[in-house]
Amino acid sequence: MEEFKGYLQKGGFKQQHFLYPLLFQEYIYGLAHDQGLNVNASTFNEPPEISGYGNKYSSLLVKRLIIRIYQQNSFLYSVNNSKQNRFVGHNKNYYYKMICEGFSIVVEIPFSLRLVSSIKETKEIMKFQNLRSIHSLFPFLEDKFSHLNSVSDIVIPYPIHLEILLQILQCWIQDVPTLHLLRLIFYDYHNRSNSITPNKSSYGFSKDNPRLYRFLYNSYVVECESIFYFLRKSSSYLRSTSFRPLLERTHFYGKMKHIGVTCCNDFQKTLWLFKDPFMHYVRYQGKCIIASKGTHLLMKKWKSYFVNLWQCHFHFWSQPSRIHINQFPHFSFYFLGYLSSVPINLSSAKSQMLENAFLIDTFTPKFETMISIIPMIGSLAKAKFCNLSGNPISKPAWAELSDSDIIDRFGRIYRNLSHYYSGSSKKQSLYRIKYILRLSCARTLARKHKSTVRAFLQRLGSEFFEEFFMEEEKVLSLILPRTYYPLHQLSREPIWYLDIIRINDLVNHFDL
């Protein structure tokens, strides 16, 4: 990043927001590939003197490539001409991918510089490093959701129109050539994809260029949430929490009180104006959760607000029927691998007044998180640890490894799952996962030694797996003093860790 800043200041590009010249810097593509590129100039049909020393990557090759991108229909040659032009075929996909990877590095520079400058301006953000953890969100839900009435689980609509994305980026990137090149890349890939598969989405390049896709998606989400931030900042009722520390909250936007919401379309027509006395907004992956203590009518207004926001501001048609308003405690929702709900717990207390005794029933809502075992078994079956019925099977791909490596892999998977699901209110499903992985490990070892599982376990003993499948509460009992928590109580209470910054692949059941 310091090298980026030095180049921008040296060339005078920082003040004018010129990013286009960075596309011709070799270190940009070295960063994109995390190594030096060895691109042969003959693949470009260029003479050796253009490629530079040692046939290494040259900025002149990128310049020639960008010129070809600007040429009309440069990627849409017929099959008959593909033999005469080496730019067509498998090479064109490589060229396109190379430009996109370098381009994704370049367009992130304004955002990265702004984040670095904001961190230097204040040290307040350093106090919230623990909020990087995914588990840091669950204590907030435990504290707040038990007092709320309504919740709505919304899928953020995507993709939006390409021109809307470009309009969003114009607020951040003021370099016209860079935006023009991005537009050409969008439509060029769109045309090439539709010429092969007409029904393919225009954002099919998410698999080919995940970094550029994530950048575009995050830009769109930031635009959505910046509207909430603007309303929150402009409201006279909101004077409590600053927005700057919330930059560190990867999956948490913040609490909003008494928000006066106004949404205007192109005709400056006010759609809604209302105040919510207690509203919470949480975003995770491709979804967001809106929870409120208000009435059902107020939630319907929020629903209409989101629909009008997507239709008027982003020109994206969103069906109102896809946004469901649910009432606690009769609703459970999937959240970061957990099945979350707010059931009503009944507790009775005996009260005695003089000679009369009374039983007082107290209904207390409590936020609970459980492991959804059916999707979890589906993930384990997809990874070839069991079948769809949950019966453990061997892992033939690991049968060539040593015994210690096989056991270490299975044990590491279970420890990671146990670590992630430590916040579950009920541990029975976690024991089921442990059973599947232990027996799958035994079947894999028995397959390797051409023996049965019973004979293998009798020869080594069941204690052979204990050190590799150590329980989470046993680990905590070694760390915490004995007087800090009783072991039986520790196994029942949810435990949230502040070192989990990504979702386990087996936990992420759904393609969002």
From Swiss-Prot:
* Keyword match tRNA processing: yes
Q: Which domain of life is it from?
A: Eukaryota
Q: Does the record's keyword annotation contain RNA-binding?
A: yes
- Any GO molecular function: RNA binding
Q: What is its main location?
A: plastid
Q: Which GO terms describe its biological process?
A: mRNA processing; RNA splicing; tRNA processing
- Which Cys-Cys disulfides exist here? none
Q: State its location(s).
A: Plastid, Chloroplast
Q: What does this protein do?
A: Usually encoded in the trnK tRNA gene intron. Probably assists in splicing its own and other chloroplast group II introns.
Family assignment? Answer: Belongs to the intron maturase 2 family. MatK subfamily.
> What HAMAP family does its record include?
MatK
The name this protein carries in UniProt is: Maturase K
Species, as recorded: Lemna gibba
